[in-house]
Amino acid sequence: MSLFLPKNPLEVSERVLREKIQSADFLLSDEKCSHRLVGLRYDPSRMKGPEVAVVCARHEMALAKQIALSLGKKMYVRPEFSAVLFREYYCGERLAPKDYAAAAELYALFYRNREGTFPRA
């Protein structure tokens, strides 16, 4: 049995982080963009509600911001909501109904600025 071990483990973590950030519709951060970064994704045709695409903490922030900027991801400064998401959810977990209103507000802003149209379920 062959086990693939990368020469540089950081390459793997950077690739995984890039894939997770790329899968997010947009990102939320604290006011200084230095403590936490949380990404949300939602596809109404196949999901019951928004889910957390990526969660980054302090030690990943520099790389995560660099990746997000290179991908052209929209970042919103929402300290309270990003703290709730960071504290209560894991990557890949669907949001609880109690957080739908805050997420819907951000999605409305995101789609209004993006295309002026909303996705249909």
Feature annotation, model-predicted:
Residues 1-121:
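Divalent-cation
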